[in-house]
Amino acid sequence: MNNLEEFLDISEEVKEALHEKKAVVALESTIISHGMPYPENVESALNSEKNIRENNAVPATIAIIKGRIKVGLNKEELEYMGSNKNIAKSSRRDLPVMLALKKDGATTVTTTMIGASLAGIKVFATGGIGGVHRYAQETFDISADLQELSKTNVAVVCAGAKSILDIGLTIEYLETFGIPVLGYKTENFPAFYTRESGYKVDYKIDTTKDIANILDTKWKLGLNGGVLVCNPIPEEYEMDKDYINKIIDETVKEARDKNISGKDVTPYILAKLHSVTENKSLKANKELVYNNCRVAANIAYDYSNLSR
């Protein structure tokens, strides 16, 4: 750990929890800086942390601030990430640049996994993962999240992937790289706003204790890489599949026509969705994240008990 102190600031609360082998759940900061408007983004981040605390775990929101990987943000730092409009999304390729040049960066799934792993955190809650984009056979637009899942030992609890992606190809990619896809109490791979995508997970697992045991077994075997835990959006917040997919299809086409590509695609589509659905999609987004936080906290709690 000593050689990482040059780059890593772990909050006292998180440091103490890790030292005492308590449950800790990592959270990303892209959802704060790029996923929701201010001040709802900060309020949502605080609620995410609250949901984790209420389920026997310590939250550790991760961000890059002035060239430091911060693991566990205080209220002022959350406010800074939420209100500052000049914070870039930072993936694996950006990390050394951001740190060397003392920049600010919002952590994606990829960089949150890296930060969590450096700190010794094994469970991370997010909204949805990136994946293989539609038309990837032409653009080669494949999220770095998938590669990170293949090599970094952190479990990612999510509501599947947004249907802005090619979900079938995303699942094929996960299989190719040996990433287990578990469904928490479901056989279906969820599609973020909806509970089903038309595709299946690898295994339906009904308890967080079983998921914790799977993580423990995988890493004890020396099988490096994460595990994807798919936790569908609660039924009461699920959006109509045909309605949301129609809007997404139109917006994906619009983005292509405007030559919007790479890491600008998802924020563009999300902003459009929030506008067209009169913020119903924003409400759904928040609730699925809170739901993932609760499940992740329970997994982290059960996992921490294995090492006591």
From Swiss-Prot:
Q: Which reaction does it catalyse?
A: D-ribose 5-phosphate + uracil = psi-UMP + H2O
Under Pfam families, the record lists: Indigoidine_A
- Which residues of this protein are catalytic? 28 (proton donor), 162 (nucleophile)
Name of this protein: Pseudouridine-5'-phosphate glycosidase
Kindly give the InterPro entries that the UniProt entry links to this protein. Indigdn_synthA-like (IPR022830), PsuG (IPR007342)
- Record-listed Mn(2+) binding positions: 141
Q: Which cofactor does it need?
A: Mn(2+)
EC numbers: 4.2.1.70
PANTHER family, per database record = CARBOHYDRATE KINASE PFKB DOMAIN-CONTAINING PROTEIN, ZGC:136858
Q: Which UniProt keywords apply?
A: Glycosidase, Hydrolase, Lyase, Manganese, Metal-binding
Residues annotated as binding substrate are 89, 109, 143-145
Q: Which species expresses this protein natively?
A: Brachyspira hyodysenteriae (strain ATCC 49526 / WA1)
Domain of life of the organism in this record? Bacteria
Q: Name one GO cellular component term.
A: cytoplasm
Q: How is the cofactor bound?
A: Binds 1 Mn(2+) ion per subunit.
Q: What does the record give as the function of this protein? A: Catalyzes the reversible cleavage of pseudouridine 5'-phosphate (PsiMP) to ribose 5-phosphate and uracil. Functions biologically in the cleavage direction, as part of a pseudouridine degradation pathway.
**What GO annotations for molecular function exist for this entry?**
hydrolase activity, acting on glycosyl bonds; metal ion binding; pseudouridylate synthase activity
